[in-house]
């Protein structure tokens, strides 16, 4: 049967549209099926809120409407990596606020170890939420290093979660990814276990310790 060029064009467009409509659900199903159950689980996508463990959550900057949810989650401490005052949205909610402003493009090992220790200390008092502005770069960096140093994940597994866990575009996490890729995992774990401020003996924090000790000598 002879078909006009217009008819063939209509058939082609219908085929392309059908493939697109079918491909979307299939891709979504494939993504859901391949997402590791060990990765942080979504709680409230509107603020990029995810549950990393029973005592640790991560998110973008929350708002006043988030307070009721955080109270249901029994969050006791909010750790912020930005300069904004969390009391602006928390109000008088009975939540401890810990302000640790950082920059993912120039974070160092001493800062990472300090944050990890403060997260662990806060977790002993109850669930903790850590956040930055968008919940992917600064928060992603500390979440990945928590996975690696505290929970014992390997570097690649932590990077996979960071980049494909649904927290944002991979391009938005370039600084965090660069730090994680270059991190001295063994050195950080050893320093964490030994209570040292940095894996490097020449880090500024160690120099300060030496100077303080020297000044204390009679």
Swiss-Prot record:
Encoding gene (name): tpbA
The protein's name in its UniProt record: Dual specificity protein phosphatase TpbA
Role of this protein: Phosphatase that regulates diverse phenotypes in P.aeruginosa via regulation of the concentration of cellular c-di-GMP. Acts by dephosphorylating the membrane-anchored diguanylate cyclase TpbB at tyrosine and serine/threonine sites, leading to inactivation of TpbB and reduced c-di-GMP production. In vitro shows phosphatase activity toward p-nitrophenyl phosphate (pNPP) and tyrosine phosphopeptides.
Pfam families: Y_phosphatase2
Residues annotated as signal peptide: 1-28
Active site residues of this protein: 105 (proton donor/acceptor), 132 (phosphocysteine intermediate)
Entry comment, domain topic: Adopts a canonical dual specific tyrosine phosphatase (DUSP) fold, similar to eukaryotic DUSPs. Conformational changes occur upon ligand binding.
Record's subcellular location: Periplasm
Key words of the record: Hydrolase, Periplasm, Protein phosphatase, Signal
Catalytic activity: O-phospho-L-tyrosyl-[protein] + H2O = L-tyrosyl-[protein] + phosphate; O-phospho-L-threonyl-[protein] + H2O = L-threonyl-[protein] + phosphate; O-phospho-L-seryl-[protein] + H2O = L-seryl-[protein] + phosphate
Keyword Disulfide bond attached: no
Transmembrane segment boundaries: none
Keyword Transferase: no
Alphabetized GO MF terms: phosphatase activity; protein tyrosine phosphatase activity
Family: Belongs to the protein-tyrosine phosphatase family.
Enzyme class: hydrolase
Location of the Tyrosine-protein phosphatase domain: 44-188
SUPFAM superfamilies xref list: (Phosphotyrosine protein) phosphatases II (SSF52799)
One of the record's GO cellular component terms: periplasmic space
EC number: 3.1.3.16, 3.1.3.48
